[in-house]
């Protein structure tokens, strides 16, 4: 007998795991809108309080992938997603979105999966629109952008239509739930290389192991120890890496790469327009904390994408991509191509 919603809720209250096949069934009921908003809210809150297991998260991600509108990308050699869970409360400018242009200019293919702001001042979709990028493209058009420009942006609501059954519940609850954790695990192009920023150190090990179970090849999950869901200049960064089937955890420090330790206060923004202006400043080569933070994160992404042999080598490629103007040119190409394909 499949698990009932009431049984699943009881498990969470008793701090017991919902097993893989049970979680598949439960998640399909949620995605199909078969549960009432009250029951959905109770279960996802119960999971959060209990703490979701890697098995529960992996099963939920499998169902979200099953229900998603895919983007088919034939050339997957250096295909990478640069994504954050959000929820770090830092209200920084869109570092991973900026790093995407830099990584693409240095040779990665970026399939960026993102949405509007939930907890920050500016989500990736918000800043992309502020930059003039058309974010509502058909899957075939996104695949062409990846092939021709090296970047494709997948606006999450367009690829996860079943999430409409959960969206009102998430909004009303206003707290982090399993769905914050699932975003980086449900890239519609199923990129084999991933850089994920997370909002809590416990998620480093969870995300890297979930991505391993979901078939990823080279993954770096990062948590800035100052609370940032990015590789940070303000503190050490905890890294969980999956490479050649092996998982390792270690810290990296700005000084390891010749970067100055600096507070993230200078990276804070209040609107998508401010985020856009800071992002453009970085791509135009303005020196400072924003430039160095983006170079570090693009360097990690280039290492994850197997374009660079190490984070340090990736950082050097990132700096060169900005200095040459190639990163800014990528942005201009993406604006033009998305409008041509719209």
Swiss-Prot record:
The keyword Amino-acid biosynthesis applies. It catalyses: N-(5-phospho-beta-D-ribosyl)anthranilate + diphosphate = 5-phospho-alpha-D-ribose 1-diphosphate + anthranilate. 5-phospho-alpha-D-ribose 1-diphosphate binds at residues 84, 87-88, 92, 94-97, 112-120, 124. One of its GO terms (molecular function) is anthranilate phosphoribosyltransferase activity. Keywords: Amino-acid biosynthesis, Aromatic amino acid biosynthesis, Glycosyltransferase, Magnesium, Metal-binding, Transferase, Tryptophan biosynthesis. It comes from the Bacteria. Mg(2+) 1 binds at residues 96, 230. Anthranilate 2 binds at residue 170. InterPro entries: Anthranilate_Pribosyl_Tfrase, Glycosyl_Trfase_fam3, Glycosyl_Trfase_fam3_N_dom, Glycosyl_Trfase_fam3_N_dom_sf, Nuc_phospho_transferase. The keyword Membrane does not apply. Its EC number is 2.4.2.18. Pathway: Amino-acid biosynthesis; L-tryptophan biosynthesis; L-tryptophan from chorismate: step 2/5. Anthranilate 1 binds at residue 84. One of its GO terms (biological process) is L-tryptophan biosynthetic process. One of its GO terms (cellular component) is cytosol. Its cofactor is Mg(2+). Mg(2+) 2 binds at residues 229-230. Binds 2 magnesium ions per monomer. Homodimer. Catalyzes the transfer of the phosphoribosyl group of 5-phosphorylribose-1-pyrophosphate (PRPP) to anthranilate to yield N-(5'-phosphoribosyl)-anthranilate (PRA). This is Anthranilate phosphoribosyltransferase. It comes from Verminephrobacter eiseniae (strain EF01-2).
């Amino acid at each position: 007998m499949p698990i009932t919603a009431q049984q699943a809720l009881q498990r969470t209250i008793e701090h017991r795991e919902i097993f893989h096949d049970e979680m598949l069934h439960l998640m399909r009921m949620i995605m199909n809108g078969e549960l009432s908003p009250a029951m959905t809210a109770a279960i996802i809150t119960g999971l959060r309080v209990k703490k979701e297991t890697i098995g529960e998260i992996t099963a939920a991600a499998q169902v979200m992938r099953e229900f998603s509108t895919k983007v088919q990308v034939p050339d997957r050699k250096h295909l990478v997603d640069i994504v954050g869970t959000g929820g770090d409360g830092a209200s920084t400018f869109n570092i991973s979105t900026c790093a995407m242009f830099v990584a693409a200019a240095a040779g990665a293919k970026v399939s960026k999966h993102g949405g509007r702001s939930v907890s920050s001042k500016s989500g990736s979709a918000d800043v992309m629109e502020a930059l003039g990028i058309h974010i509502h493209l058909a899957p075939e058009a996104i695949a062409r952008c990846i092939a021709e420009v090296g970047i494709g942006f997948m606006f999450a609501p367009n690829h996860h239509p079943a999430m409409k059954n959960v969206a009102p519940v998430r909004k009303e609850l206003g707290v982090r739930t399993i769905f914050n954790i699932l975003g980086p695990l449900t890239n519609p192009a199923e990129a084999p290389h991933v850089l994920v920023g997370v909002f809590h150190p416990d998620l480093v090990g969870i995300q890297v192991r979930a991505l391993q179970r979901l078939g990823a090849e080279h993954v770096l999950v990062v948590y800035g120890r100052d609370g940032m869901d990015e590789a940070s200049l303000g503190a050490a960064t905890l890294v969980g890496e999956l490479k050649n089937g092996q998982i390792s955890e270690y810290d990296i420090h700005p000084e390891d790469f010749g970067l100055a330790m600096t507070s993230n206060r200078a990276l804070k923004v209040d609107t998508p327009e401010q985020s856009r202006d800071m992002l453009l400043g970085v791509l135009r080569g303005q020196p400072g904390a924003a430039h160095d933070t983006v170079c570090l994160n693009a360097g990690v992404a280039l290492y994850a994408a197997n374009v660079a042999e190490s984070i340090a080598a990736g950082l050097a490629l990132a700096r060169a991509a900005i200095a040459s103007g190639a990163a800014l040119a990528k942005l201009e190409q993406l604006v033009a191509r998305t409008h041509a394909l719209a």
